[in-house]
Amino acid sequence: MYENKMNLEFVSKSQNEAFARVAVAAFIAQLDPTIDEISDVKTAVSEAVTNSIIHGYENKEDGIIKIEVEICDGEVTIEITDNGKGIEDIPKVMEPLYTSRPDLERSGMGFTVMETFMDGLLVESEKEKGTRVRMKKKFNILS
């Protein structure tokens, strides 16, 4: 059971990445996070949305990215979903420095950043059907 929930949907334009991270940060502000915690969440959301745009939709601006954020007992769950091309080998793409787009000079650190800044990361994907990234972060609630 969640205490609060938000859903957001937008087209896969790179300009919307900043909007997504600010919207999620504004929503979790109700937990009174530290500046570092907000920065961690914004960075993780930015990486996931950027992956959807660049890899899932291959920079095509007609895809849809969905974000669902739930707060329950001081824990935030963020799901970012696309209906893009999917990931064939999830363990491979989660290796640090691996990139499927060296032509774009991508660093291959997106999933590593998400794992580092969040308390939990789960990636589910099906080829040609899309990808869902689920991230969790626990916040210390002051009474």
From Swiss-Prot:
One biological process term from GO is: asexual sporulation
Q: Name one GO molecular function term.
A: sigma factor antagonist activity
Q: Name one Pfam family in it.
A: HATPase_c_2
Q: Which InterPro entries match?
A: Anti-sigma-factor_SerPK, Anti-sigma_F, HATPase_C_sf
EC numbers on record:
2.7.11.1
Keywords for this entry? ATP-binding, Kinase, Nucleotide-binding, Serine/threonine-protein kinase, Sporulation, Transferase
Q: Which family does it belong to?
A: Belongs to the anti-sigma-factor family.
Q: What is this protein called?
A: Anti-sigma F factor
Q: Which organism is it from?
A: Clostridium botulinum (strain Alaska E43 / Type E3)
